[in-house]
């Protein structure tokens, strides 16, 4: 599919569906765009969860009941320590030259950052080169703003059929584009010592019917990679 066809035909159709379909997440409630969740315990890890898509918490009124809360509890279970997760649902791949101030402020004391892909219409219509450039820009700024030992985790763009009930006509190109974006993200992670790619292929009910019942399962797919890296940082200086 050419970029011209993608932007001239497919993108408007997909945006119309996302705005009007009863299967879309858009009409669901969601928490405030930023918030904090915590699990008490010794020597707590401080984590920034940032991005659109699954971080937003569609279907929930509180981040404690959405991905942020479940991720904090899963990581604490694995590490035996406390966990504090600051959730910022700004789409850092939107093309803005600079990260929002609230993101850079949190980064100053973060042990780890978990980046989730943005909304389907913001991500899957990006040419691969632009996606890589925007992601690289965000990673450069995060690395500069955070402590030297901070780890950054890029959660894969999932097969969209597993998180949203896409119309059949969109599924083939969505699968191809998602795979291409993940290839770009993996390449960036290989080039950076502090950046880890986290595979993410959930199962279960997609779309509105699954939202709110799947955050626990999604967190279980992400938490092990984060917990292992946090446990491996024996020289953490920001505790």
PLM region spans:
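Alpha/beta-hydrolase-fold catalytic nucleophile elbow
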Residues: 116, 155-156
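Short acidic/His/Gly/Ser-rich catalytic and metal-binding motifs that mark active-site loops
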Residues: 122-124, 160-165, 206
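Substrate-gating cap/lid alpha-helix
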Residues: 163-198
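Histidine-centered active-site loop/cap adjacent to the catalytic His
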Residues: 181, 206-239
């Amino acid at each position: 599919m050419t970029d011209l066809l993608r932007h001239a035909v497919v993108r408007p159709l997909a945006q119309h569906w996302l705005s009007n379909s009863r299967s879309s997440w858009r009409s669901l409630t969601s928490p405030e765009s930023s918030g904090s969740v915590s699990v008490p315990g010794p020597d707590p890890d401080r984590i920034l969860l940032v991005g659109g898509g699954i971080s937003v918490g569609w279907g929930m009124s509180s981040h404690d009941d959405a991905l942020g809360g479940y991720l904090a509890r899963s990581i604490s279970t694995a590490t035996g320590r406390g966990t504090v997760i600051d959730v910022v649902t700004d789409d850092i791949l939107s093309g803005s030259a600079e990260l929002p101030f609230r993101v850079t402020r949190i980064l100053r004391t973060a042990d780890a950052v978990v980046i989730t892909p943005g909304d389907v219409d913001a991500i899957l219509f990006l040419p691969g080169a632009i996606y890589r450039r925007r992601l690289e820009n965000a990673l450069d700024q995060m690395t500069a703003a955070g402590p030297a030992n901070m780890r950054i985790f890029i959660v894969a763009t999932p097969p969209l059929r597993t998180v949203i009930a896409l119309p059949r006509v969109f599924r083939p190109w969505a699968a191809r584009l998602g795979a291409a974006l993940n290839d770009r993200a993996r390449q960036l992670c290989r080039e950076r010592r502090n950046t880890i790619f986290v595979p993410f292929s959930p199962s279960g009910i997609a779309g509105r019917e699954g939202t709110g019942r799947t955050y626990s399962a999604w967190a279980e797919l992400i938490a092990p990679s984060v917990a292992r890296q946090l446990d491996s940082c024996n020289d953490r200086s920001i505790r």
